[in-house]
Amino acid sequence: MSSSNNSVVYWGTGRRKTSVARVRLVPGTGTITINGRPGDHYLNFNPAYLAAVKAPLQTLGLNEQYDVLVNVHGGGLTGQADAIKQGAARALCELSADNRKPLKTEGHLSRDPRAKERRKYGLKKARKAPQFSKR
């Protein structure tokens, strides 16, 4: 293992709903690898998911300069794509402190607090009540 290769890896962790993504940025050609598979295959070629994953790099104009290597688990594809987006943004902040301001104004660094609401007893779902019968 060469020490020069290890010194230019930038890490970031992102979360969304129940998804957790560990993102590594390595100088390269701009390929995205998620759980060992190409990013477009993993995200089912969905343009919205691919745009979300690439958004932090495009904000800074670095989309062809870094490879994105991701380990992600939990949740569905929407949560995973947004978790990857946040992890990539945090890794870019580690790359340079000047990157923080444009990423923050675009909203890539904020953790989306929305999660599934718990089911309450006496109700069918989180808020749906059983049918009311007057008589």
UniProtKB/Swiss-Prot annotation:
Ranges for region Disordered: 96-135
One annotated GO biological process: translation
Biased composition annotated in UniProt, kind: Basic residues: 116-135
Coiled-coil intervals, chain numbering: none
PROSITE patterns, alphabetized: RIBOSOMAL_S9
Keyword terms of this UniProt record: Ribonucleoprotein, Ribosomal protein
One Pfam family in the UniProt entry: Ribosomal_S9
GO terms under cellular component: cytosolic small ribosomal subunit
Annotated Basic and acidic residues bias: 97-115
Molecular functions per Gene Ontology: RNA binding; structural constituent of ribosome
TM segment ranges: none
PANTHER family: RIBOSOMAL PROTEIN S9 (PTHR21569), SMALL RIBOSOMAL SUBUNIT PROTEIN US9M (PTHR21569:SF1)
Family under the similarity heading: Belongs to the universal ribosomal protein uS9 family.
NCBIfam families listed in its UniProt record: PRK00132.1
Name of the protein: Small ribosomal subunit protein uS9
Organism, as annotated: Prochlorococcus marinus (strain MIT 9303)
Origin organism lineage: Bacteria, Bacillati, Cyanobacteriota, Cyanophyceae, Synechococcales
